[in-house]
Amino acid sequence: LRNALERSDRMLIRMGDPEVQALSAVAFTGTSVMDIDAAKVRGAGSNVHFDKVSVAYGAHVVLHPLSLDIAPGEILAMIGPSGSGKTTALRAVAGFVRPASGRIRIGATDVTDLPPYERGLGMVVQNYALFPHMRVEDNVAFGLRAQGADKGLVTERVKDALGTVGMSAYARRYPRELSGGQQQRVAIARALAVRPRVLLLDEPLSALDAQIRRNMVEEIARLHRSLPGLTILYVTHDQTEALTLADKIAIMRDGRVCSHGPTTELYRRPPNRFTAEFLGRANLLPVTIVEGVGLKGFATARHGDAMLAGAGRDEKAGAKSLLCIRPQHLSLTADSEHTNRIVGTLREVHWQGELTHLMLDVDGTPVRVSATRLPMALPEPGATVPLFFTPADTSLVPEDAGV
């Protein structure tokens, strides 16, 4: 019966269910068992290279020519709104989508024309794709058995993979006996058991509730620290997941990458308005440049009657720009570093546990303040409130760079 069920599983994969088919990248990785055994996960990650890769369905282009590199051992998060092309890009790497043009390389191998099971990948999808009639240990072993691995190697790999994700005690349970977070750990263990060159994570936490999702983000970060050579392409719409996990981020919009770079750099110095607003919350004050970047590394800009110092790109006097300030960098009290000052009218106050959010109007521009500490007596809505911030916590974004 078990053999018949496993043959049925293979048939489901061939029938093309996208989520079950995604498992084939895990189960039927093309790297032979002997090759995988020689290339331990630590230090064995491969780079991924997109060379002008585009995807179209008929006349509709869903991914415009994409050129991008993911370094070995790196976590790259692709984020963007629905329909931005991020999942299409991942599925092109997996081999589920055929590029209309361009090439994809994993390591030194051009995989553009290879089927999913010959690409040496691991993949975890949103709904986990665990086989309900198999115990945890058999789900994790599925890919290895499909490769023809001997029993001893399967036992060793399953034990190692379950230990890595903290699920050793659940080896004999069925998926229905596990929580959502535990099922996701099993799915990750199954992907790791085949020692993939690259791990693809497609919205892996979106089906979990908020608390479990936060815990799983920490688990994935811990996992990558324990396997520093593992290359990960992580697709998500959740900016917090991307900011927490990724070494680099590619922000997608309308089938194009509108920004790409180190996570901290994109957050602190967004190159365009869309990045500033999509990657966390941002206050964007319209300003006019008065003087370009000086010796201290800041430009001088005017917002209404306020003269402000801003970091970022050097622009000519008279240029229109946007001064980006994150809500947590605004303060209701000044200190020696808070040399920038603006004044707004308080509209609303929202308490959210450890944070209090103040909504203000500054010369017609909505401004949010997120604070952990506030004066004992908060001003009433309608009151005039001064706000202070440091030049180093700002970034000038060109007004015409909305992308």
Show the residue positions of the predicted features.
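Pre-Walker A (P-loop) beta-loop-beta motif of ABC nucleotide-binding domains
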Residues: 66-77, 131
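Non-catalytic connector elements of ABC transporters
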Residues: 1-8, 12-31, 35-37, 282, ...
